[in-house]
A protein has these predicted regions:
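RNA-binding basic/glycine-rich loop and surface signature characteristic of RAMP-family CRISPR effectors
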Residues: 1-281
Length: 281
């Protein structure tokens, strides 16, 4: 058994919007999680809702980056919705026929791990087969006065989580003139959303479990793709969510083995993808 940990830090270079499940009127709130904190005023422990970035948000973004890159390296055009979801969204478990009793096809799982290294890292489901990912993506924990007792490297960090929250707004404008009279004004709706302000810091961790050399190299490739498009959260198309990545230990890995493997096995991998597409059209 081998476990590799890569601890790092994220710093917001532009406001981050990572929406939670709740709204307040027309305001979209950021994700907060109940946390035992130390009240900075009296030093006593209490429970409060503290902002965080969900690990699934980071994992999902990295999945899309590495899978798009994987198909580009193969010059492969995918023609199956189910296989697309298998590669890009985590897939769907389903029975293949009424007689399916949930039997696991070990040969298929082995070929998936061998020929699609990104899936071996992030996991997925196809038909009745589930492939567990070897990559664990932690939550990005905000660095603030309320949580610094969890963080050994930030003893002197005194910004409250409440001071790190911001807000912004946008408008939706109905400009379809043909649907209203000439003297009628266009309807405009204002919406608001919470953000975490520029300069907010997070601690974060990746864990690789029992990965072979190609899978480790694939992880490095994934991280390099993130560095090329260093965003997190929503509304990145309008400038939100740009982050500075600082994971010095990942520099010990190289993406050479992964790129070489994909190049040398391109035909074999494409044929396997064709097989999957025929079964799960």
């Amino acid at each position: 058994m081998e476990t590799l940990r890569f601890k790092g830090n994220l710093t917001a270079l532009s406001p981050i919007h990572h929406g939670g499940s709740e709204d307040y009127g027309t305001t979209k709130l950021i994700l907060t999680l109940p946390t035992i904190i130390v009240n900075p005023l009296n030093g006593e422990e209490e429970i409060d809702n503290v902002p965080a970035i969900h690990g699934n948000a980071i994992r999902g973004y990295l999945r899309r980056l590495i899978m798009d890159d994987f198909l580009t390296l193969l010059d492969y055009e995918l023609d199956s919705k189910k296989v697309y979801h298998f590669l890009f969204t985590g897939g769907i478990l389903e029975a293949l026929d009424p007689k399916d009793k949930g039997a696991i096809n070990l040969t298929l799982k082995k070929k998936i791990r061998e020929l699609i290294p990104p899936i071996s890292l992030v996991g997925s489901a196809l038909g009745n087969q589930m492939v567990q990912g070897k990559l664990k993506v932690g939550m990005a924990d905000i660095v603030c006065a309320e949580t610094k007792h969890y963080l050994t490297d930030y003893d002197d960090y005194n910004f409250s989580a409440y001071n790190l929250k911001g807000s912004d707004f946008g408008t939706r404008l109905d400009d379809l003139k043909e649907e209203r009279d000439d003297d009628e004004q266009a309807h405009q709706m204002k919406y608001e959303f919470e953000t975490l302000i520029r300069g907010t810091k997070f601690t974060h961790e990746f864990i690789l479990e029992d990965c072979n050399d190609v899978e480790k190299s694939c992880f490095r490739r994934m991280f390099e793709l993130w560095k090329e498009r260093p965003y997190l959260g929503g509304k990145s198309s309008t400038g939100y969510g740009k982050v500075k990545l600082d994971y010095p230990e990942i520099n010990s890995l190289s993406d050479d083995d992964y790129l070489k493997y994909v190049d040398e096995n391109k035909e074999l991998i494409c044929n396997f993808l064709d097989e999957l597409v025929k079964i799960w059209k």
